[in-house]
Swiss-Prot record:
Disulfide bonds: none annotated. Pathway: Nucleotide-sugar biosynthesis; UDP-N-acetyl-alpha-D-glucosamine biosynthesis; alpha-D-glucosamine 6-phosphate from D-fructose 6-phosphate: step 1/1. It comes from Rattus norvegicus (Rat). It is an enzyme of class 2 (transferase). The keyword tRNA-binding does not apply. Controls the flux of glucose into the hexosamine pathway. Most likely involved in regulating the availability of precursors for N- and O-linked glycosylation of proteins. Regulates the circadian expression of clock genes BMAL1 and CRY1. Has a role in fine tuning the metabolic fluctuations of cytosolic UDP-GlcNAc and its effects on hyaluronan synthesis that occur during tissue remodeling. Its EC number is 2.6.1.16. The active site is at C2. Residues 2-287 form the Glutamine amidotransferase type-2 domain. It catalyses: D-fructose 6-phosphate + L-glutamine = D-glucosamine 6-phosphate + L-glutamate. This is Glutamine--fructose-6-phosphate aminotransferase [isomerizing] 1.
């Protein structure tokens, strides 16, 4: 939801202008997450001595787009942009309103007081903020915003003002604060009392740190420091930070640190990152990065690795396309190849998902598969349920994560639970994962983000390798999730003689899939023409059954998300149980009819719609002469094996949604009220 970005330069001279450009660009890379306002916090003052400027913090906040914030920055009369800083921390934030309407005062950074002694940026929701606010108000603290985050900033100041000794560390203050917080958060703090220092922490929301230096780093594995005991007067109670317990450039050379909600904001600066775990507190003091935890638990890993990201800047740029969504739709021939690369051997008809190989025997012995997800990821589970049931011969449940939790669904030790999420941070799906782990089920993650919470907390998993997806409306991640689940089904039945012919048929379908997707994408002009006939409508119905019911749901979701038209995916078998009442000559209807086991029943549904003066547009097999001959308007897609046909039938709906949104004048990549990464429940 919200986007966090912070930049600390240590002995790397940067002008205020350069620092602001870095912060603004970081926020622009996070725009796809969704937001309604933005802000930055940096050292104020115009003294030639940067250390004097660090005693004052300046906040600039603006409702609306990051571009509006950038314009506001350059309107500041009292800020010399050419002042140079040898050491500086700047923090920046894109806010998605949860507590309080979008406005400058509710935007982040939030401050502790009018002197900006402590400021903080926050992604998440603090569930006990009302109690904390009541306590702080009783101590004389005045609140200016409606946000839960302001309580955090004021709580740090309260701790600082009431600390027994004068030598408290910034890290200790933050540790004490997060012990009082309930809910989900990723936080980065800045203070006039600790110039040039940064402290970041997370619980339930993502946070990573990028490291950039021209010099060799002291380690590629940062050990965790634990509290040694109770705080004593004159002591912070922490394990000692020294050259063996922190990260820094050898010989104390120049270094830059980037705190961010996800990798897209740091990749243009560095590909070396550290992913923080829940309750980690990361501190940069004198250019050295250390990671602290309050308590030691049995499952704690002894350190945090410096990882190298396999991502390039060009992957998160639009290139020659008008929007990220359009680019991602047209990347699907390559993204499905990347999903299969190194995993499917078309010569000997084998599938090897490396992330599952150590657990595949255990999965094959299970009693039930449960697929848990939200939104488009849920539809990917729905789309592959039938082939999973067919090839595994196991009962397969597909659950919306929020409903799964609301029902306290029974889960057993011999269940295998899949958690599907593009970002790997979806809050409801993550809560479902923890629910299933508590009950002893084997957990499997299917994500598109290396180092995400779901990929780390599951027992095993599959990385779909679709590449960064920036557009809020998911497209290529859906088809890659689809292919990943089909590959899993093929892996599950590789030793069953009775399944071998079916496996070969599906694998030949996978081999041809990229070329068939290209063929569907070549129909873009035809679909754009259809969009010009539909964009003024208020509603659209999409009907299908069997493998294509999930396609109807996904197509309807895409249209809802970015065109703001009412759209509904309808199971064709349910037509007579209510939806048929909506059909008349004015209601736009799209039907999906493919030559599979539901063909005759879909033809029956088509006749029912036509009999009510409906004028359906039919997405059908290009070899289906009967449907083409008897229907006035068709979109003809190439034929594939039945369980993969849903990939080819969903792409025309993705293109239709895109063109409808453009014709209606809406921002395709950033639809209103929606965020790419839903990190709060």
């Amino acid at each position: 939801m919200c986007g966090i970005f912070a930049y600390l330069n240590y002995h790397v001279p940067r002008t205020r202008r350069e620092i602001l450009e870095t912060l603004i660009k970081g926020l622009q890379r996070l725009e796809y997450r969704g937001y309604d306002s933005a802000g930055v916090g940096l050292d104020g003052g115009n003294d030639k001595d940067w250390e004097a400027n660090a005693c004052k913090i300046q906040l600039i906040k603006k409702k609306g787009k990051v571009k509006a914030l950038d314009e506001e920055v350059h309107k500041q009369q009292d800020m010399d942009l050419d002042i140079e800083f040898d050491v500086h921390l700047g923090i920046a934030h894109t806010r998605w309103a949860t507590h309080g309407e979008p406005s400058p005062v509710n935007s982040h950074p939030q401050r502790s007081d009018k002197n900006n002694e402590f400021i903080v940026i926050h992604n998440g929701i603090i569930t006990n903020y009302k109690d904390l606010k009541k306590f702080l108000e009783s101590k004389g603290y005045d609140f200016e915003s409606e946000t839960d985050t302001e309580t955090i900033a004021k709580l740090v100041k309260y701790m600082y003002d009431n600390w027994e000794s004068q030598d408290v560390s910034f890290t200790t203050l933050v540790e004490r604060v997060i012990q009082q917080l309930e809910g989900a958060f990723a936080l980065v703090f800045k203070s006039v009392h600790f110039p040039g220092q940064a402290v970041g922490t997370r619980r339930g929301s993502p946070l990573l740190i990028g490291v950039r230096s021209e010099h060799k780093l002291s380690t590629d594995h940062i050990p965790i420091l634990y509290r040694t005991g109770k705080d004593k007067k004159g002591s912070c109670g922490l394990s000692r930070v020294d050259s063996t317990t922190c990260l820094f450039p050898v010989e104390e050379k120049a270094v830059e640190y980037y705190f961010a909600s996800d990798a897209s904001a740091v990749i243009e600066h560095t590909n070396r990152v550290i992913f923080l775990e829940d309750d980690d507190v990361a501190a940069v003091v004198d250019g050295r990065l250390s990671i602290h935890r309050i308590k030691r638990t049995a499952r704690d890993h002894p350190g945090r690795a410096v990882q190298t990201l396999q991502m390039e800047l060009q992957q998160i740029m639009k290139g020659n396309f008008s929007s990220f969504m359009q680019k991602e739709i047209f990347e699907q021939p390559e993204s499905v190849v990347n999903t299969m690369r190194g995993r499917v051997n078309f010569d000997d008809y084998t599938v090897n998902l490396g992330g599952l190989k150590d657990h595949i025997k255990e999965i094959q012995r299970c009693r039930r598969l449960i697929l848990i997800a939200c939104g488009t990821s849920y539809h990917a589970g729905m789309a592959t349920r039938q082939v999973l049931e067919e090839l595994t011969e196991l009962p397969v449940m597909v659950e919306l994560a929020s409903d799964f939790l609301d029902r306290n669904t029974p889960v057993f030790r011999d269940d295998v639970c899949f958690f599907i999420s593009q970002s790997g941070e979806t809050a409801d799906t993550l809560m479902g994962l923890r629910y299933c782990k508590e009950r002893g089920a084997l957990t499997v993650g299917i994500t598109n983000t290396v180092g995400s919470s779901i990929s780390r907390e599951t027992d095993c998993g599959v990385h779909i390798n679709a590449g960064p997806e920036i557009g809020v409306a998911s497209t290529k991640a859906y088809t890659s999730q689809f292919v990943s689940l089909v590959m899993f089904a093929l892996m599950m039945c590789d030793d069953r003689i009775s399944m071998q012919e079916r496996r070969k048929e599906i694998m030949l379908g996978l081999k041809r899939l990229p070329d068939l997707i290209k063929e569907v994408l070549s129909m873009d002009d035809e679909i754009q023409k259809l969009a010009t006939e539909l964009y003024h409508q208020k509603s659209v119905l999409i009907m299908g059954r069997g493998y294509h019911y999930a396609t109807c749901l996904e197509g309807a979701l895409k249209i809802k998300e970015i065109t703001y038209m009412h759209s509904e995916g309808i199971l064709a078998g349910e037509l007579k149980h209510g939806p048929l009442a909506l059909v008349d000559k004015l209601m736009p209807v799209i039907m999906i009819i493919m030559r599979d086991h539901t063909y005759a029943k879909c033809q029956n549904a088509l006749q029912q719609v036509v009999a009510r003066q409906g004028r359906p547009v039919v997405i059908c097999d290009k070899e289906d002469t009967e449907t083409i001959k008897n229907t006035k308007r068709t979109i003809k897609v190439p034929h594939s094996v039945d369980c993969l046909q849903g990939i080819l039938s969903v792409i025309p709906l993705q293109l239709l949604a895109f063109h409808l949104a453009v014709l209606r004048g809406y921002d395709v990549d950033f639809p209103r009220n929606l965020a790419k990464s839903v990190t709060v429940e």
